Every structure is written in C-alpha cells, then in structure tokens.
C-alpha cells in the first residue's frame, strides 16, 4: 500500500501494481496511454516530483509520498498554451503520443524557459512518434516556450479555413489534452476482458482442445472455441482464408493464430486462464522462406491450395528485352528489402457491448468501419452489428485487417456483456500484417544520352500466413516499378508466396517503396555510366504533362515531377559544389485504388437540430486529418463558416461507406464526394431555403473514380485517376557521415492544408529513414518474430536530421478541387536517396536494406 498525490489529490493504493494500471484502471486518467507496457514508447509519460517518468515502469508501492502529474492536472493556462502551440505547429496527427509529449514539454519548460533546439530534442528523446517525424512537435515546444515567456496567448487570427489555409486540425484540443477516446479509453459497467490462446507452432494440426481448467478459474465467464462461433469461422480482407479460431482438425498457419478466447472479470485472470487451456497438436514441417515455399514438394501452407503461390503478376508493354539488347548501357542487379513493422503507437483494441437496439456495438480502431462491420457480421451470423470508429492511434496500412474487433464482438455475443479485447504489444508485433520483404532482379538499358530504353524485372515477395492484401501490393509494386519516367518498353514478373511467417499486407507505400529502391538505385548507377549527374538523368527522363507512362497512361497537366526536381536542384547542386555526399531519388504513387476496381467516396451533409452542419462519411480518420480536409472543402464550396461545421467520426449506421483509408485515396475520392454534396446544399440555399428549412435534410453525394483494368485492351489505359510525384535529396555531414538534411519536394496537386502536407512529408521521411538505415523486424527459423517495441530500431527526436519539406502546389486535377493525397508517397523515394548518398561518400554500392556500414547500423 502507498499514499501519494495525483494532480493535487491524495490517493491510497490497495495493491501493488504498475502506476500505469493504477492511473488508467482505477482513476480512469486516460490521457496516460498504454502503448507498450515495456518502458519503450513513452506514451504513458507522467511527471513525478518534477521529472518525467514512464508510468508503465514504477510499482505503486515505490511511490509513497510522491507527487504525480498527468495531463489532466495541467492548469487552465497550461491547457491553453499547449493546445495553441501544438495546433499552431501542426504537431498533432493520430494523437496517441501527444499527451506524453505534452508532459515532456511541461517538465522542460518548468525548469528551462528558453530551451535550445538541442535541449528540446533531448527532452523528447525517450518518447516515440510514428506519425509526425518529430519536426512539428519540436516546433510546438518552441512555440509553447515563447508563449510562456511572454505570458499571453497571441490574438486569434481570423483564418478563413478555405482550401490552401494553414489551419490547426479540428481535433487538436481533445488529442493534446487527452480527452478524446481511443477504444482502450472506454471503461463500461460490468465490462469483461478478453484474452486469446495462440498457436504454439507455426504449422500444426489441432487435434483436441481441453478448456476444463480454464473454466474452473474464479473470475472466468467464458472460454470460446471454434464450435461456439454462430456464423462463419473464416474471414479476410479480400479472401476469406483466416480462421477466427482454429477448429479441431484445422491447420495453423502462423504463431498468431487464435485457438481459443477467454472472457474474464479482469485482464490478469483472462491471461492466466488462456494459459490453462490445453491443446494437443500434430506438429508439421513449416515454411520459413520463399525458397522453401517455391519447391515443388514443399509442404502447403493451406490444405486447400495447389501450391504456395498467393499471387502472380506479369505486366508487359513494348519489347523490353529487345530494347535492352539494343541499349548503349545495360545494368543488372539483385536487390532486397526487409520485413518492416508499422509500429503505430496504439496497440489494437476493441470494446463491444449490446446497445439498446439489441445490436452488438463495437468501438473500433481500424481503417474502415464498414469493413469491420462486414467481417464481424460474418462471424456472428447476423446483421445486427454496429461499428463506431473511436480515435485511431495510427495505422499506415496495419489496421486494414481484422485483429481484435471480431474477437471482442464474439465474446460479447457469447457472454451478453461488454468486453474489451486489446492486444499486448508483443501480440500486436506478431498478429497484424507487415510490410512485405521483396527480392528483386532488375535490368535497365539506356542510350548514350541517358534516356531509358527499357526495364525488365522479376520480383518475389513473402506474403506470410494469409492473403491479406498481398495480391494488390504485388500488383502495385509491379506497375510502379517502371518509375515516373517517359519510356515505352517495360516488363515485370512478380510472385507472392505464402509462408508460415506472420502475414504481410498493406504498409505505407503499398509495395512501391520496395521496387522504387531497386529502380532508383539502378538509375543512379546508370547516371555514372553515362557521365551525367543523377539529377540530370532524372530530369531528362521525367514524365511531363501529356506524355505517356510505361503503363500506357497519358498523364494530364496536373503532373508535377519536373517541378519537384527543379525545387530540390539548388540544394542538390550546392551540396555537390561543397564536396558533400549527396543522393537523390524520385517516385510516383497512385491516389485511389485504380486498375478498374470500383473506388467510391460517399458523404452525407446534414443540418441537425443544433443548426450545425454535420459531416458523415464512412472513411476512417487515422491521423491524416480527413476531418479537417472535409471541413475545408465545405468552407471553400459553400457560405458556411468553420464554427458551424461538425465532423462526425465514421460509423456504420449513418455514415455511408467510403472505402478504406488507404492508397492516399480519401482526400481525392471522398473529398470530391464532399464537394458534390456541397453543390446540392448550395442549390437549396440559392433557392432561398434557410438553415431552419434545411434541418434534417440529407445532402448525399458520391464519386466513383473510373479506371481501366490492368491489361485492358485499349491503347492508353487510365490505370489511376491521379498520381502524386516526389523528389527527395539526402545530404550527408562530411565529418560524421550522418544525414545532415533531407530535402523532400512533393507534388500534392492543390494543397488543402499546407501545414498538414508538411507534417505528412516529415513523418513519411523519418519513417523511411528508419527503413533505409536501421529498422528491423527479424523472424527466426521457427517463424517467431521480434517481441519488443523498443528493439525495432525506430528513430527518436534527437536523432532526426533537418528536413526541408517543399509542398509543390500544382492544381490541374479536375476533381476534389485539384487535391491529391500524399500520405503514402512521402515514404517512397527516401531509401534510394540515402543509399546513393552513402555510395557518394565511400564508393560502396548497397543493394539491400537496412544499409550496412553506416553510422546508424545496429550490430548484432
């Protein structure tokens, strides 16, 4: 037992536990986030006796007499300062890390009123952010320090919130102060806690399950196995190949497969009971590598499949082999990229209960509430299900697949009680799909002037235990491997193999990040052969408006690759002139699904009784700022002011399905739907209707992005409605060999909110600095992956270089007011630019990631 103060109130503990659990589970101070419970991420940072501390580390018995402060304990003045500073800087995206960052800010400014940038970075060094790249968080601390010094908040600037305005996101306040709720922040009366027993082996047949001992444990209310599932057992994003629970006689596919579920009155009891479930297995040989998977006599990951091939793509235009044969210069090489973990700060969590309509209601953190609804309904065998997005603590593709939502819903269905199902960080690292490792052989031919004549490639990817989005990822990797250049002859073969490793699926860049590394590295090598700079070879080959891409699509006048090259040119040439090692990479990335797949955005605008216009869309806001984008769309296309607009989080009973938040599609696809809804609303206003007349009327619109299927028999297929383009430059410090600066120029069409665009660029760059230099997701020969968040190799605030984010504002696209999403492309060209910079420094080409022999390399 211990007695201490929390936010000025005396508290007394009844049992020894981690401070994090006491603050959240007993005091319900939910600004203190549980990101890892291993002392790594910093999301649970509080202040103890004036110093920051991760609340998941100390036991309460050791805190007798201490004074603890959480975000809930800030003064009214501090709340205003930090909300203003973090909003003004654009420092908030998903928001999960922000309360911890605010605590670090307060602890610093309480003792240092004028911190230097290095002191700010040092104060933030123990806290991870996966969204922002830290740049704007550092800016926020600097702004807060200035306001604290001056003792007064700046006067509000009358920002009109039109497209192009640098505005603070609409959800800044609730994320800075920790009042917004993620699923784990819900504590319901009578709530049970779920836990899963997962497979002991990557590939085995389940022979029997004995749950007797688990059921006998006091506090356990249910132990659920496959026979208890009322609907379909198998689910999956595109292909229903993943068991909800492995049945007796069923085959496990990886160590993350759930065998049974427990619902208990507390989490400790649920976890203990899961370990008491006894499972008899027939252990079978497993597949760990694609080489093993490709053997004719290999064990099959799926009983029902003919082989271990998940997807195969062959794309060809022109005659690549002949063009390469006739080229002046030809270069071939093998490239490899690794598994990568999304490392979003919020572990997966869902809370479910029966609502007053008798429906199973699920609070979810996902990238599509309607997809969650579909798969939960399949498992429960009923359409009496509702899904509501709570705040989503980052996704990057990793929350497109089901992980806990259907399990929580199933436990509620069985017990008739509220249930919280949350993955531990180790479970999260195991269960959700990762970035595919790619193995690529690529050949490029050029003429004497460096003009690309043809490219031929063969790639293979490990898609792990399930299909997930492996097929579309492979397809996008192949279609974009040609690069953003103007030439005709291109051929690529791609194969994705099943293994018994954790599944691979969507990840920021969607396969393009991997093939871009190979293509851009070959182009840098080709520049040396031709005798021109890597910048020049790109400028000569860059796709320009009304030219034809290697896939046959004629691009329009919104195409801005040349502008991105010209934007980085001054710093690129200055670095060369100064004798610095400098590398460069370009990229393009589709916005929207494309290739003939139906891609629809939908929006409802409704004046409610409060006389405010409410925005309803089934698109998930996962940190990219969709609610702010739609708000700016409305202000720009109507006479409605910002203060009269309310953005509602995605749900499945009012908000129309707008597809997944992926593929940089929501700004463009749902943004255009919103613009069309605005047109309908303004027709009524122009006809003389007042707000009172319009209350309850639904202004619904949708936008279907029409494209041609892959391989369509047309001369110039429209594969995608839009592409974003980018050029990034890496400059190394001549003394230390570390990155001095990344210059990142991105064509965003019309920038809806330049502040948010910069934040997306900075976050994507830092994510791929990690991809290029240090991040690892090792999987051992028994298909067991890393289990510690702190061992992933993520970059921290004090390690990031200067990032010059250049937003190229080039309208021209005829929909969504010219806006193109940039969430994915920001991370694509970084790695090849960094790799080329290190070649310029030491003359050693590196063909696999993370790069070896750099100052950032982790040994062992």
Residues of each region from the PLM?
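Short beta-strand elements
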Residues: 46, 174, 180, 184, ...
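Glycine-rich loop/linker segments at domain edges
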Residues: 90, 165, 171-177, 238, ...
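Flexible, low-hydrophobicity surface segments
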Residues: 145-309, 330, 414
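Phosphate/diphosphate-binding loops
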Residues: 258-259, 264-266, 417-464, 671-691
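Conserved beta-alpha junction segments in alpha/beta enzyme cores
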Residues: 320-379, 475, 585-612, 617, ...
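Thiamine diphosphate
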Residues: 395-416, 420-421, 626-633
């Amino acid at each position: 037992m211990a007695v201490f103060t929390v936010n000025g109130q005396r508290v007394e503990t009844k049992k020894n536990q981690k401070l994090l659990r006491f603050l959240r589970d007993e005091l319900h101070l939910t600004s203190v986030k549980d990101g890892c419970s291993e002392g790594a991420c910093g999301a649970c940072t509080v202040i103890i006796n004036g110093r920051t501390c991760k609340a998941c580390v100390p036991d309460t018995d050791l805190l007798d007499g201490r004074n603890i402060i959480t975000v809930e304990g800030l003064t009214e003045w501090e709340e205003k300062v930090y909300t203003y500073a973090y909003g003004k800087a654009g420092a908030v995206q998903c928001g999960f890390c922000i309360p911890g960052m605010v605590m670090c800010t307060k602890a610093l400014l309480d003792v240092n009123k004028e911190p230097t940038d290095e002191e700010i970075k040092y104060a933030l060094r123990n806290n991870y952010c996966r969204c922002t790249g830290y740049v704007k968080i550092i800016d926020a601390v600097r702004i807060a320090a200035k306001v604290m010094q001056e003792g007064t908040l700046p006067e509000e600037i009358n920002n009109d919130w039109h497209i192009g305005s640098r505005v603070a996101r609409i959800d800044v306040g609730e994320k800075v102060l920790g009042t917004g709720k993620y699923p784990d922040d819900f504590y319901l009366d009578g709530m049970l806690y779920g836990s899963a027993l997962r497979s002991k082996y990557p590939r085995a047949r389940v022979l029997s399950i004995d749950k007797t001992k688990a059921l006998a444990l006091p506090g356990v209310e249910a132990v659920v196995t496959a026979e208890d599932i009322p609907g379909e057992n198998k689910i999956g994003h595109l292909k229903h190949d993943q068991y909800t629970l492995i049945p007796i006689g069923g085959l496990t596919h990886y160590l993350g497969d759930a065998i049974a579920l427990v619902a208990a009155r507390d989490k400790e009891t649920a976890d203990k009971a899961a370990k008491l479930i006894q499972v008899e297995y027939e252990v079978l040989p497993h597949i760990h590598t694609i080489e093993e998977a490709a053997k004719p006599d290999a064990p099959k990951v799926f009983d029902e499949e003919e082989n271990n091939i998940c997807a195969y793509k062959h794309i060809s235009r022109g005659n690549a082999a002949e063009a390469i044969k006739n080229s002046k210069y030809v270069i071939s090489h093998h490239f490899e990229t690794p598994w990568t973990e999304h490392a979003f700060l919020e572990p997966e969590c869902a809370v479910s209960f029966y609502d007053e309509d008798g429906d199973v209601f699920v609070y979810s953190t996902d990238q599509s509430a309607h997809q969650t609804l579909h798969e939960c309904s399949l498992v429960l065998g009923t359409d009496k299900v509702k899904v509501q997005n709570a705040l989503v603590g980052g996704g990057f593709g990793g929350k497109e697949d089901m992980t806990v939502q259907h399990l929580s819903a199933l436990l509620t269905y069985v017990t008739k009680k509220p249930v919280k199902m949350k993955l531990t960080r180790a479970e999260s690292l195991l269960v959700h799909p990762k970035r595919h490792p790619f193995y690529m052989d690529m050949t490029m031919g050029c003429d004497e002037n460096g003009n690309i004549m043809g490219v031929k490639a063969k790639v293979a990817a490990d898609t792990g235990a399930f299909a997930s989005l492996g097929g579309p990822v492979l397809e996008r990797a192949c279609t974009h491997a040609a690069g953003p250049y103007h030439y005709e002859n291109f051929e690529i073969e791609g194969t994705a193999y099943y293994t018994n490793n954790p599944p691979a699926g969507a990840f920021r860049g969607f396969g393009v990040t991997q093939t871009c590394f190979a293509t851009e590295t070959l182009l840098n090598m080709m520049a040396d052969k031709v005798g021109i700079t890597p910048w020049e070879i790109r400028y000569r080959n860059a796709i320009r408006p009304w030219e034809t891409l290697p896939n046959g699509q004629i691009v329009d006048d919104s195409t801005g690759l040349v502008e991105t090259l010209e934007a980085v040119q001054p710093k690129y040439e200055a670095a060369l002139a100064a004798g610095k090692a400098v590398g460069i990479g370009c990229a393009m990335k589709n916005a929207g699904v494309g290739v003939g797949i139906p891609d629809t955005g939908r929006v409802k605008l409704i004046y409610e009784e409060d006389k405010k216009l409410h925005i309803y869309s089934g698109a998930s806001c996962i940190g990219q700022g969709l609610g702010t984008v739609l708000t700016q769309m409305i202000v720009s296309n109507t006479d409605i002011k910002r203060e009269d607009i309310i953005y509602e989080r995605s749900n499945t009973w009012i908000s129309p399905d707008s597809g997944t938040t992926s593929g940089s599609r929501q700004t463009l696809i749902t943004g255009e739907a919103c613009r069309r809804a605005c047109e309908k609303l303004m027709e009524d206003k122009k006809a003389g209707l007042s707000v009172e007349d319009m209350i309850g009327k639904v202004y619904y619109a949708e936008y279907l992005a029409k494209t041609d299927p892959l391989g369509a028999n047309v001369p110039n297929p429209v594969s995608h409605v839009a592409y974003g383009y980018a050029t990034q430059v890496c400059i190394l410090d001549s003394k230390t060999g570390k990155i001095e600066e990344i210059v990142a120029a991105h064509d965003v069409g019309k920038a809806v909110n330049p502040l948010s665009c910069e934040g997306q660029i900075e976050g994507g760059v830092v994510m791929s600095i990690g991809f290029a230099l240090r991040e690892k997701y090792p999987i051992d020969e028994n298909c067991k992956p890393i289990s510690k968040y702190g061992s992933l190799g993520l970059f921290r605030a004090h390690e990031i270089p200067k990032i010059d984010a250049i937003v190229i504002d080039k309208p021209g696209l005829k929909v969504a007011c010219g806006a193109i999403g940039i969430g994915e492309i920001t991370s694509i060209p970084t790695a090849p630019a960094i790799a080329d910079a290190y070649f310029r420094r030491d003359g050693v080409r590196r063909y696999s990631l993370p790069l070896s022999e750099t100052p950032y390399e982790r040994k062992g």
